[in-house]
Amino acid sequence: IDFLDHATVLRDYYPDCEAIVREATGAAVVRAFDHNLRSAGGKKAKERIAGGQEVQGPAHVVHGDYTLTSAPQRLRDLARPPKENDTVRGILAEGETLLDADRVERAIESGRFAIINVWRSIADEPVATNPLALCDAERVSPEDLVVFEIHYSDRIGENYFAKASARHGWYFYPAMTRDEALLIKQWDSSGHLARTRGAEPDSAAPGEPCTFSFHSAFQDPATPPDAPDRRSIEVRCAVLYD
């Protein structure tokens, strides 16, 4: 797959990601709706995806992609015809929606929905620079969450930043290859934090699903100075369980 070709990724790679998430979750509906290509060298060189956006650098900030407000709103957005900045404009007919509006409302009001990223290296070499770390959701408290808005030309999104805490525990998968994929839970409406509207942490309900995982690229002190650049792609998938 030519990951620098926008149309090719939507046509050929999105279905692969949907199949991976569907197999992992058993969900009834999985639809990929957005992606980012990341490379420090590509960002510096202002590399651009054919038919799409510029290549982004690794995100060196602890964050979660969605909030109590923006997660359900993003699904509702995907149940409407795509707007100017919606990636799936390239695969939908005029007036077509990615998700069924009635099904989305049922999932939000009384069912279960999630947003899951499929993160993968696309370089020939294993990841050595700017690897991705994920925070244990059971060690995050509601007071650690800081909402920040992202203003697009056609909508306003919300992410979470994290307040630093000695409670946090971090994990990463070293030397990931292009034959491996990491599924990152960006939101799960069945998580305890989500179900209590942010009043209680996921740790208050051990054994239940977590709501989301903070994540960030980081500088590994063990990385050799001549290590190759990380090139990765993440694809966001909307997941409806019912």
Locate predicted features.
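Non-heme Fe(II) oxygenase catalytic core, chiefly the N-lobe of the double-stranded beta-helix
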Residues: 1-159
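Catalytic core of Fe(II)/2-oxoglutarate
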Residues: 156-242
